[in-house]
Amino acid sequence: MNNKKTVWETKQFFLLPIIANYELFFIFAPLNLLLKEINKLTMGASQDEMSFLDHLEALRWHLIRSTIAVLIVGVVAFICKDFIFQIIFAPKNGDFFTYRMFCKIGHFFGFESDFCTEQLPFTIQSRTMAGQFSAHIWTSIWAGVIIAFPYVLYEVWKFISPALYENERKLARGFILIASLLFFIGVLFGYYLITPLSVNFLGSYSVSPEVKNQIDIDSYISVVRSSVISCGIVFELPIIIYFLTKLGVVTPDFMRKYRRHALIVVLIIAAIITPPDVASQIIVSIPIMLLYEISIFISAYVLKKEQNKVI
């Protein structure tokens, strides 16, 4: 019975962020209709010829619609408090999926692992009267930013699309899908890898047995939030390199030349955010270097297409 319960808990924790996005997607199905109606009211004029002020007005409404989407998702996240904070506080528990995985990896290679623990040596506290309420509000807003990210990208595309050729518009539609996918993969990477590694290392670090770790709730949530969002942005590297290559800022030769430097930077970052064992550092470094190599391939592809256009 205990084994069955453990398997279920593992699946539950592993799927929590995915389930959250899935459920909120269906909750906000009417959101698209609402924003379309706002779009009809505010963007009915032809965009064939627009002055600078017209562009500013259009940008203002794109920002307003994006903000509305983020706030609506944030309100639902605020209502689903228990579910959201179950996700956030899961990495502080010793039976979190990632800790069990690293513990098994350590046993496989025959060395002791800091992840083989039932409970991390710290507690979370709120030291101000409005601390928990403030944390609830800001967590809901950031949940709105993460979940509504594809729609925000869509609004960005709608703003720049009038200036694009038809073939570039088709490419931009693919950009929204790929960029959203990369972002959510990065979010999951940050949640299941970077966050538990950071929480385990920082929460367990001690300069003296005399000092007990009593972490403020804002500090803990900040670590989770920064890990998740920063990884989501880092995973946009191929998209960023694509546009930088189109603009002539970056070339594949430049990226190949500084590949070793990039590897050193990645290893240093991995050494900072992971416990001092080689296995953890390698597991963190490999996906980031893989993204770098993919970005080199994309840069070469874009440069070749641009050169063919000139010819």
For the regions a language model picked out, list residue spans one by one.
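Short, often N-terminal, low-complexity regions
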Residues: 6-17, 24-29, 33
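Membrane topogenic/interface segments and analogous intrinsically disordered interaction regions
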Residues: 27-311
